[in-house]
């Protein structure tokens, strides 16, 4: 009994001492934030697991300013210049702020890819891979992308013939995954053809909550490691099922006799020089699917909802599209880039409903560094949280309203800090897929609005009331879909 009481006393003493140290003696003590966040990592974990940390971070920045202490060893920066300071290019003698291992390497057995490799291996992979994401490659990929978008329109026409009430979110997800699947593995997932998700994709619905739980457990390895051991067999079975399917797809892509304008071509050409194993190719292709297709599908759903939620915006965009194109043959990946209001709608969606939403954390290197003029000690986790920054009135007028005009020089938004919007990030690790995402999104919405009249269903009026973990928790987006007369898909 004495030993148990002594143990409890010791634990309580340690916890109280740790809390006092974190709040009042830690190297980050001068940075403001709520007491519980400054004192313990548990407050942050509670906010993350609740799926509403983007609201919490915004509230903190509104109260405390551009720099907030989210946890004892973590800072959030909410300022347009913070992007470059954290993620930007460094001088030759400067060490970059590397990606936080607890966020990017959740499991020890994970294969490394361009997203979680260290600086030098990342650059080694990125150079040959970047060719597949260039403007020229996008033009070469045009027929492939157009084929899937035309099939998307055809399947919507068939679906609307059965019922004008269509689950548009499903079809937007199908077209996004089929396009990226083809450009990653050389073949689609067959979602559009079958009218349903591939099993490989269905399991991604659990990725957000499962992934964020294990990320949070990473702060408590004495809990995480036993759990990983307990569930190792189940997790390995889940992983191997995906790996087997992906590996077979990659084998077929490698055996393809000829060049394709896809994401993998550059790596295949440099495979021997870079000493790339089959699993390295598979890991990067899976990344394109997991990150690229999911975020693109999220953007597509966001654009659709926000357009249909705002009749004025939808009608103005519809007028722009029908004024620009008289027949479907005029619609190409190149021509859809010349629509200023459409571009503004996409940018405003990226601001209002950022697919990334929260921060992608970096680590301050040895010797510390300066961010927004403030010295930050080494081993501090730092990040810019997209949603919170984009919804601050300090940088965007009327931030909680969907106003594409802010990207068209409207005087009402003359003081907006548009450089704060960095959905694809900055620096040597910025997202390669920017050109593809914009091109694909433009083409899909021009053809969708050219072929159909859309109206938001009553049951989806509050669709954007969502929680966010690694991805948004999206409910079905229901839309009334009516084919336009005399338009053939």
From Swiss-Prot:
Which GO cellular component terms are attached? membrane
| Membrane topology, as annotated | Multi-pass membrane protein
Q: Which cofactor does it need?
A: heme
Per UniProt, the keywords (alphabetical) are:
Coiled coil, Glycoprotein, Heme, Iron, Membrane, Metal-binding, Monooxygenase, Oxidoreductase, Transmembrane, Transmembrane helix
Kindly give the SUPFAM superfamilies that the UniProt entry links to this protein.
Cytochrome P450
What is the uppermost EC class here? oxidoreductase
Major place of localization?
A: membrane
Please give the pathway this protein is involved in: Secondary metabolite biosynthesis; terpenoid biosynthesis
Q: Which residues cross the membrane?
A: 1-21, 212-232, 287-307
Q: Where in the cell is it found?
A: Membrane
Spell out the Pfam families in the cross-references: p450
Q: Which residues are glycosylated?
A: 347, 379
Q: Write the protein's name.
A: Cytochrome P450 monooxygenase prhB
- Which species expresses this protein natively? Penicillium brasilianum
- Phylogenetic classification of the source organism: Eukaryota, Fungi, Dikarya, Ascomycota, Pezizomycotina
Gene symbol of the encoding locus: prhB
């Amino acid at each position: 009994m004495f030993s148990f009481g002594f143990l409890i006393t010791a634990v309580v003493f340690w916890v109280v001492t740790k809390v006092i140290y974190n709040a009042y003696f830690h190297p980050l003590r001068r940075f403001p934030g709520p007491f519980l966040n400054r004192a313990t990592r548990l407050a942050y974990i509670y906010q993350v697991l609740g799926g509403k940390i983007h609201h919490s971070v915004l509230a903190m920045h509104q109260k405390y300013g551009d720099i907030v202490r989210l946890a004892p060893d973590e800072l959030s920066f909410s300022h347009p210049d913070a992007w470059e300071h954290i993620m930007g290019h460094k001088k030759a003698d400067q060490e970059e702020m590397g990606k936080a291992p607890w966020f990017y390497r959740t499991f020890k057995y994970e294969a490394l890819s361009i997203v979680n490799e260290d600086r030098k291996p990342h650059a080694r992979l990125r150079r040959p891979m970047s060719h597949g994401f260039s403007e020229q490659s996008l033009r070469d990929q045009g027929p492939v992308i157009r084929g899937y978008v035309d099939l998307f329109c055809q399947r919507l026409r068939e679906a609307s013939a059965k019922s004008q009430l269509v689950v548009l979110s499903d079809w937007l997800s199908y077209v996004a995954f089929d396009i990226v699947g083809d450009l990653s593995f050389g073949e689609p997932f067959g979602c559009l053809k079958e009218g349903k998700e591939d099993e490989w994709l269905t399991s991604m619905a659990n990725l957000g909550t499962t992934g964020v739980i294990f990320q949070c457990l990473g702060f408590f390895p004495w809990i995480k490691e036993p759990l990983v051991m307990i569930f190792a067999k189940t997790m390995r079975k889940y992983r191997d099922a995906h790996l087997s399917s992906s590996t077979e797809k990659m084998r077929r892509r490698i055996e393809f006799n000829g060049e394709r304008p896809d994401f993998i071509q550059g790596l295949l050409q440099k495979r021997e020089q870079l000493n790339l194993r089959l699993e390295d190719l598979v890991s990067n292709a899976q990344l394109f699917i997991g990150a690229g297709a999911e975020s693109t599908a999220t953007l597509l759903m966001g654009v659709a909802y926000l357009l249909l939620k705002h009749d004025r915006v939808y009608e103005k965009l519809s007028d722009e599209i029908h004024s620009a194109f008289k027949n479907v043959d005029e619609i190409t990946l190149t021509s859809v880039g010349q629509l200023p209001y459409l571009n503004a709608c996409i940018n405003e969606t990226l601001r209002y409903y950022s697919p990334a939403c929260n921060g992608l954390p970096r680590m301050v290197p040895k010797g510390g560094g300066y961010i927004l003029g403030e010295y930050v000690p080494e081993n501090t986790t730092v990040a810019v949280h997209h949603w919170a920054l984009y919804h601050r009135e300090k940088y965007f007028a009327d931030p909680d309203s969907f106003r594409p005009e802010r990207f068209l020089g409207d005087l009402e938004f003359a003081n907006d800090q548009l450089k704060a919007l960095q959905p694809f990030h900055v620096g040597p690790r910025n997202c390669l897929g920017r050109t593809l995402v914009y091109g694909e999104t433009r083409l899909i919405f021009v053809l969708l609005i050219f072929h159909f009249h859309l109206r938001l269903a009553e049951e989806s009026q509050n669709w954007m009331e969502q929680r966010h973990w690694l991805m948004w928790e999206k409910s079905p987006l229901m839309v009334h879909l009516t084919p336009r007369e005399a338009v053939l898909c």
